[in-house]
Amino acid sequence: MKQSFSRLFGLNDKNDDAELTANEEVQQLAIKDIVPNRFQPRTLFDEDRIAELAQTIRTHGVIQPIVVRVRDDKYEIIAGERRWRAVTSLQWETIPAIVKEFNDSQTASIALIENLQREGLTAIEEATAYAKLIEIHNLTQESLAQRLGKGQSTIANKLRLLHLPQAVQDAILNRDISERHARALIALKDAEAQEAVLKQIIEEQLNVKQTEERVKAYFKTAEEEAPKKKKPKRKSYPKDMRIAMNTIRQSVDMVMKSGLKVDTDEEDNEEFYQFTIRIPKKK
């Protein structure tokens, strides 16, 4: 049987949780005393979906209590932030909740895992959740992939998005561009270039293929505009002078081939070219 994410991260299974909470007291906690989870990977909540949930709660009430823990003088949400937001929008004063004891590591893991099992996270939110799980549990990308039942390349590709400029990450969070758009921008190593192409994507409503072509064009333009490396100019000498210089060099070579050690220096002065030949008196 496939193990749940929770059990793989050293936490109780949801089914075990249900059995444990069956006998736990459901309390009515004041909305004003409840704060969101600090480790919540979801940074943007769909207001329309929250409004729909609020309407359902108005009609049927909160069927499943939220789960919280005591932190300082407040209750921090562990699971159920959407329900809490919906009830808050209804301006109700209390919400049914179960108070549990969890440390920071457990609280973060539950929040991250719960959200990873839901749909609707943006690629950046998902990448942030992976990064936090790796940090909290001291995992490698490979071991995290195994625990989540995903390919290592999937984890790696998501994490690369976190190296993009904040402007690009914000565009993903706001769903202005897709993950595939963002991955095309990764090829541009320069943040300024990435932001420039991002602007084109949004203003011109480029699709992924057009974005990839724009990235290729950016590379081509940059290459054409880059200053060409000039080859050092070879100094030109009159023909007679070149013959004389080569004759001296050949003569030195002949002497050296005879076994005699010869030291030479050449110096190009403004008015003359100087050869210095030194022949030691002693071998």
From Swiss-Prot:
GO biological process, one term: chromosome segregation
Gene Ontology MF annotations: DNA binding
Portion annotated as DNA-binding: 142-161
Keyword Cell cycle: yes
InterPro entries cross-referenced by the UniProt entry: Chromosome_partition/occlusion, HTH_ParB/Spo0J, Nucleoid_occlusion_protein, ParB/RepB/Spo0J, ParB/Sulfiredoxin_dom, ParB/Sulfiredoxin_sf
Keywords from the UniProt entry: Cell cycle, Cell division, Cytoplasm, DNA-binding, Septation
Gene3D superfamilies: 1.10.10.2830, 3.90.1530.30
Predominant subcellular localization, coarse grouping: cytoplasm
Localization in the cell: Cytoplasm, Nucleoid
Family listed: Belongs to the ParB family.
Role noted for this protein: Effects nucleoid occlusion by binding relatively nonspecifically to DNA and preventing the assembly of the division machinery in the vicinity of the nucleoid, especially under conditions that disturb the cell cycle. It helps to coordinate cell division and chromosome segregation by preventing the formation of the Z ring through the nucleoid, which would cause chromosome breakage.
The name this protein goes by in its record: Nucleoid occlusion protein
Organism of origin: Shouchella clausii (strain KSM-K16) (Alkalihalobacillus clausii)
Phylogenetic placement of the source organism: Bacteria, Bacillati, Bacillota, Bacilli, Bacillales
Gene of this entry: noc
